[in-house]
Amino acid sequence: SEMVKIEQKGYITNIFKSNLVNKDKNYDYVDASTVLGSSSKFGKGNEDKERYILDGNKVVYINNKGEEVTEAETALDVNKNFITTWRVNANDKIVLPFIVDQYFQGNYNCTIDWGDGSEKEHVGGENSTAQRPEHTYTQAGDYNISISGKCSYFVLSANAYSSTYPELLKKLIKIVSWGTVEAGGYGFGDAENLVEIAEPTKKTFIKCEDDSFAYLFAGCKNLEVIPSFLFRYVNENTTSFEGTFERCEKLTSVPEELFENAPNATNFEETFAYCKNLMTIPTNLFANNKQSNNFKKTFAGCTKLEEVPYELFDSTPNAIDFDRAFYDCYSLKTGPKIWERANASQISGNQRTYAHCNSFDKTGLSTDILNKYFK
């Protein structure tokens, strides 16, 4: 039988394709706790190396040795609703970060389930007043707010939301499901207690009309894990990941597959800047981003980095901006030799790529190289 790879969160196991529910189909990967809940006979779905894939209304389970394949029906459509979890105190009011402008009626036509048993609320559509939906919770707890229908924008930084409701930024703790809600632009910047992001389970991820994921999760300082296939369904014209994970202070690693489906991405400025606990960067992180030209401050302030693969930028022949790419990476000992690139003559100005990298091995480097890349 043909072998197939099931990949999730960095773990790869081979199983026989003939054992799968539909061997000719491209499978979607899913966190089983989202689909099945913690009472499933499959367990909680978060044990390391246990993996699940979704095929229609069947969930296929691969055990942690890759030797057993079972399946179960699920009544839950994980792809329908956009679901976020909020942690509230008694009598807290949650206001959702909808964009309130003249296009409100066209951007929203959705039903909101506030997750506490209260009556569902319809927002948007014709004759609707442009105002952010809000709800007060009588009891403290974690509540799943589920949105179905059309919800084009959900942006914590827009319309002065973050300055008007700074305390609400701390209450968003999970993105449980991305849903099919015609998402045009989302932003979770400075949601400092966001700890979990769902993997998209089919082509329903943010459309990003401006072709940018700029600062999408910037300042999510308690986020520990980025799903491997978070950007699996991005618009292929996506060009910018500027600041996407900037100041995600608890990240220790980055999945190698993260940007592989964004072949036209050009801008990685500050993408992981000030991720002060980041310890490893995979060699092939930018392997499919051959159009990239901007790595300004990409890893600046990543003070725990000690070694960066020499080949990290080898697949990006057009890149000419490495200004402060590893600035203030005090612990960094080795990294890409920018001065040996084929296009090194096109890299102009004082790059300061490794400025303040006090641990870096500078053996044999010329004064010109030191002045250009290390001062």
Language-model segments: what does each one mean?
Residues G66-K375:
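Negatively charged
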Residues E47-D48, L54-G56, F104-Y108:
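A short, compositionally biased
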Residues F42, Y52-I53, G66, L76:
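Intrinsically disordered, low-structural-confidence terminal and linker regions
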Residues S1-V35, S39:
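Conserved hydrophobic/amphipathic alpha-helical signal-anchor segments
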Residues G45, L54-D55, N63, W114:
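Acidic surface patches and DE-rich sequence motifs
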Residues A32-N46, E50-Y52:
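Extracytoplasmic/periplasmic/luminal assembly and interaction segments
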Residues I53, V59-N63, E68-T70:
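Short linear proline/tyrosine/threonine-rich motifs used for host-factor recruitment
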Residues I12, K58, N109-T111:
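Conserved beta-strand and immediately adjacent loop positions that scaffold enzyme active sites
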